[in-house]
């Protein structure tokens, strides 16, 4: 399953691990994703989304119906 937030569209980015001797090895930085169940009052059902912490704050602030939900790529 892809590691992409369904609200913000955040994805993993690449960077380097740096040792004490400043040797560089490639690594990936992953977004803080969680499966979370949200109540949709419009449809009176729960929706399970894979969202980042920032995506959860956006849902709390703006509401679930005002945000565009991106589909997960399988």
Swiss-Prot record:
<dbReference type="GO" id="GO:0003735">
    <property type="term" value="F:structural constituent of ribosome"/>
</dbReference>
<dbReference type="InterPro" id="IPR034704">
    <property type="entry name" value="Ribosomal_bL28/bL31-like_sf"/>
</dbReference>
<comment type="similarity">
    <text>Belongs to the bacterial ribosomal protein bL28 family.</text>
</comment>
<dbReference type="GO" id="GO:1990904">
    <property type="term" value="C:ribonucleoprotein complex"/>
</dbReference>
<keyword id="KW-0687">Ribonucleoprotein</keyword>
<dbReference type="InterPro" id="IPR050096">
    <property type="entry name" value="Bacterial_rp_bL28"/>
</dbReference>
<protein>
    <recommendedName>
        <fullName>Large ribosomal subunit protein bL28</fullName>
    </recommendedName>
</protein>
<keyword id="KW-0689">Ribosomal protein</keyword>
<dbReference type="InterPro" id="IPR037147">
    <property type="entry name" value="Ribosomal_bL28_sf"/>
</dbReference>
<dbReference type="GO" id="GO:0005840">
    <property type="term" value="C:ribosome"/>
</dbReference>
<dbReference type="Pfam" id="PF00830">
    <property type="entry name" value="Ribosomal_L28"/>
</dbReference>
<dbReference type="GO" id="GO:0006412">
    <property type="term" value="P:translation"/>
</dbReference>
<dbReference type="InterPro" id="IPR001383">
    <property type="entry name" value="Ribosomal_bL28_bact-type"/>
</dbReference>
<dbReference type="InterPro" id="IPR026569">
    <property type="entry name" value="Ribosomal_bL28"/>
</dbReference>
């Amino acid at each position: 399953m892809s590691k992409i937030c369904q609200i913000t569209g955040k994805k993993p980015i690449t960077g380097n691990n740096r040792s004490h001797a400043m040797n560089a090895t490639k690594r990936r930085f992953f977004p803080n994703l969680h499966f979370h169940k949200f109540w949709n009052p419009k449809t009176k059902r729960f929706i399970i989304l894979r969202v980042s912490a920032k995506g959860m704050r956006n849902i709390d602030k703006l509401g679930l119906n005002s945000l565009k939900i991106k589909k997960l790529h399988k």
